Amino acid sequence: MALFAVFQTTFFLTLLSLRTYQSEVLAERLPLTPVSLKVSTNSTRQSLHLQWTVHNLPYHQELKMVFQIQISRIETSNVIWVGNYSTTVKWNQVLHWSWESELPLECATHFVRIKSLVDDAKFPEPNFWSNWSSWEEVSVQDSTGQDILFVFPKDKLVEEGTNVTICYVSRNIQNNVSCYLEGKQIHGEQLDPHVTAFNLNSVPFIRNKGTNIYCEASQGNVSEGMKGIVLFVSKVLEEPKDFSCETEDFKTLHCTWDPGTDTALGWSKQPSQSYTLFESFSGEKKLCTHKNWCNWQITQDSQETYNFTLIAENYLRKRSVNILFNLTHRVYLMNPFSVNFENVNATNAIMTWKVHSIRNNFTYLCQIELHGEGKMMQYNVSIKVNGEYFLSELEPATEYMARVRCADASHFWKWSEWSGQNFTTLEAAPSEAPDVWRIVSLEPGNHTVTLFWKPLSKLHANGKILFYNVVVENLDKPSSSELHSIPAPANSTKLILDRCSYQICVIANNSVGASPASVIVISADPENKEVEEERIAGTEGGFSLSWKPQPGDVIGYVVDWCDHTQDVLGDFQWKNVGPNTTSTVISTDAFRPGVRYDFRIYGLSTKRIACLLEKKTGYSQELAPSDNPHVLVDTLTSHSFTLSWKDYSTESQPGFIQGYHVYLKSKARQCHPRFEKAVLSDGSECCKYKIDNPEEKALIVDNLKPESFYEFFITPFTSAGEGPSATFTKVTTPDEHSSMLIHILLPMVFCVLLIMVMCYLKSQWIKETCYPDIPDPYKSSILSLIKFKENPHLIIMNVSDCIPDAIEVVSKPEGTKIQFLGTRKSLTETELTKPNYLYLLPTEKNHSGPGPCICFENLTYNQAASDSGSCGHVPVSPKAPSMLGLMTSPENVLKALEKNYMNSLGEIPAGETSLNYVSQLASPMFGDKDSLPTNPVEAPHCSEYKMQMAVSLRLALPPPTENSSLSSITLLDPGEHYC
């Protein structure tokens, strides 16, 4: 015990000595100035790193000290930053501190110094600052190289929205340096003649591969060099959103979150942010490999409460979010499986499913959704392992989609995903009768009934309608009925019935059964045809119809309608109205503007006989007429004309035609009576006349001037406006006297045509009466007296070859001088004082002598020819023949003779009409044409016939030649005879 007391006394004495020493040290106020200050640089982070020590600290003592750091730039007097750094200092400890510079360290020289202050409660007051350490100079420019231009910082990484300072260093102060940010010039502040700094405030994110900044040095127009940097701007790291953890099997926690914007940059400057999951109760940490989810294994140590911290981190910042939860409250079940339907009929079904078991005695809350026919029904049920639910009140022949999902019934967290299946209920017999209506048209001796019915809705059809039964029963003969089966999907049929009353039933059938019958009665009496049609106006909402109630008992009304211009079978509709209703609105999307619709309103008696009550017609919206009438101009006179357009149909127009506008233009620009001035759409003026009666389709425009020019244009109009614009039709009134001339000339022309027709019909009689046919001499029987040699030649006889047996003086023309064509000789007056004859002479060289001669004379032809020497008897001396010149070529004469032999006189060719007088018969004499007998032998009997063809004596013909086959025609002396 005494030893312990001695030891205790010794300890306290030692402690007291130590406190006394400390007090002495403090009393001495030894200086604690920082020493051994060293400054290093980090160009990547653009930071200064300081390290120093503090001398004169007591051995194994710790003191709380404050260090004040001062940083200057370019020169020591330019202090840019002053700050304090507090820490606990140990004996012989090396202290560290870093400072990041906004200006790149390469752009300027920096100076650093430090002083200290003891801030420890163990030291008595007052405390005082130590002396400043000496300035420590930091310069990085010496290590940049020898280029003339530099831009700093290199590849700096900053966050979007921060402020950044860049600079350039130019070795040559004579250079002009321009800097650009993404092609746009920027302006900075000159720090010294070699350095200029640029402050970029709130830099934006442009691209993940960085923002381009470059500077160009030049002297005059000569570029000295270009340098640039890439400034990497990162998106701001966001705090994870919607951080949540849950389990589906109590073995694994599945944590998810929304990572927000990815902060990854190109060139591997910064990867995507990383996520770390830290659980504070267990102290475990896990680096997540996915950016939006992470799994955490649940241990079997019955831990139920978890406190998770999710840390997001990149090179620039960290973000974290925390959740605290109980494991049993975060159960997210797996999907149900094995969904099936049992005992499915037309209206009921049983749905079954299974769930994944996770714990014993676990209760599941399941939700069922049933979708069908546009409706959704929802049911909830609690189960242990297997689920089952009875679905009732279903529609027949309907496809349903049923699905189920489950959750923890004790601590609801969220529903599982859906699991579902489709099923279809069975068909049932149709539950409603078809809606039936009819159109009855009367024909001689029968009714034509067109039945229509609307297809049953899916709700009432209860399946696919296969056919319709139409039963027709004659009410006058109850035992007589007919059954017509109409296959679906037809919705109409046509029946031809006699003039009896009939009851018609329509029944719809599917694979299960038949619907109730829809009954309609066709009366033997015709419908009420005395109902007048009333015009109505529609609106955008449809047609509002009203009618007077039918006297007597009615079970309802039917309103049917159709397009006025189309086939009734293609657009026929009807609507049933209750017995106490006398108005309705017909509204449907099928109504179109400009289309006329006809409505008929029927009342249905208790016997289901329809009676027509009213007819109405109208447009849901009237439009202007779609076309103009084709106008004809009739009865055009000098003072008026009539316009008519009888063929214009008003029924097919897109509105009720209320009348017509007649526009008239004239050069006088004065409107006639009944017309008024109007201005057209093109600004031109004209006269306008309004016809208010749409059935009046003619107009007489009178009080016009003769020989005047007019233009007209007719257009119909409805309540919506006029018809389309068109060109004016031109018309000119005739002269005032032209009609009188027409009245005179037309009868004259008619008379002339009548005479010509009569003459044509009596042409044969006129010919026989006025100019009968002249007999053909070659067909005369006298020719049988003449004997021809083989191959005879037609010749003109010489004068000496024919001795006349009689002389007949035809005429004694006055003495004239005649130029004979063939010989170019003329006859004196003394030579022509006596009658002359023309002789036909033979021209054959082997002519043996005179032969028989036939002379024909016809004084009905050219008198001049007969006077100058026709076929006659002239007292001419045979010893003094006078040759008559050839009047035509021998070839033409021969052709003419041959023609006369073959044809009648009227068939002589046109080329031979130059012959004025040609004998039709020449004796076939043979001999030399040049040898004429001096003593002509008396010719045998010479038959006479009137010469039929005259030859023009005025034609100049060529002289005869030796090769001619015909002799010339000569003029004989008196006493000679010719044939």
UniProtKB/Swiss-Prot annotation:
A motif (Box 1 motif) lies at residues 770-778. One of its GO terms (molecular function) is ciliary neurotrophic factor receptor binding. It is found in: Membrane. A motif (WSXWS motif) lies at residues 415-419. Induction: Activated by oncostatin-M. Up-regulated by IFNG/IFN-gamma. Up-regulated by bacterial lipopolysaccharides (LPS). Up-regulated by triacylated lipoprotein (Pam3Cys). Residues 335-428, 433-528, 529-623, 625-736 form the Fibronectin type-III domain. It is a single-pass type I membrane protein. It comes from the Eukaryota. The chain crosses the membrane at residues 741-761. Residues 762-979 are cytoplasmic. GO terms for biological process: cytokine-mediated signaling pathway; oncostatin-M-mediated signaling pathway; positive regulation of acute inflammatory response; positive regulation of cell population proliferation; response to cytokine. Residues 1-27 form the signal peptide. Expressed in keratinocytes (at protein level). Expressed at relatively high levels in all neural cells as well as fibroblast and epithelial cells. Belongs to the type I cytokine receptor family. Type 2 subfamily. Heterodimer composed of OSMR and IL6ST (type II OSM receptor). Heterodimer with IL31RA to form the IL31 receptor. It is linked to Amyloidosis, primary localized cutaneous, 1: A primary amyloidosis characterized by localized cutaneous amyloid deposition. This condition usually presents with itching (especially on the lower legs) and visible changes of skin hyperpigmentation and thickening that may be exacerbated by chronic scratching and rubbing. Primary localized cutaneous amyloidosis is often divided into macular and lichen subtypes although many affected individuals often show both variants coexisting. The WSXWS motif appears to be necessary for proper protein folding and thereby efficient intracellular transport and cell-surface receptor binding. PANTHER family: INTERLEUKIN-27 RECEPTOR SUBUNIT ALPHA. This is Oncostatin-M-specific receptor subunit beta. The lineage of its organism: Eukaryota, Metazoa, Chordata, Craniata, Vertebrata. The gene is OSMR.
